[in-house]
Amino acid sequence: MYISRNMDHWNTFIETLRTAFKEGKEQEFLTLLLTPDERDAVGLRLQIVAQLLDKNVPQREIQQNLSTSAATITRGSNMLKMMDPDFLAWVKEQVDAETQS
């Protein structure tokens, strides 16, 4: 699991993000903090995770589908190996629900 070098900063970010969502300000908050390229990268990472969780798509095919590097796919794959299976099932459920709507 990701361990920040400064957990106080990370925890402050998480709490502020939580508050932003509660108050309906998540778009503005994340737009303030992330450049357009960073927002694209987060979206790409979610697509990578979704396809990796599908388990029917080989990594090389994911790389070609998303026009990204093998290293990017590998980083996503390595993070999946470190995460709790119940959490990954929840993520898959969320991503699948978004895909259906």
From Swiss-Prot:
Pfam families: Trp_repressor. Gene3D superfamilies: TrpR-like. It comes from Actinobacillus succinogenes (strain ATCC 55618 / DSM 22257 / CCUG 43843 / 130Z). Its main location: cytoplasm. This is Trp operon repressor homolog. One of its GO terms (cellular component) is cytoplasm. Belongs to the TrpR family. The gene is trpR. One of its GO terms (molecular function) is sequence-specific DNA binding. It comes from the Bacteria.
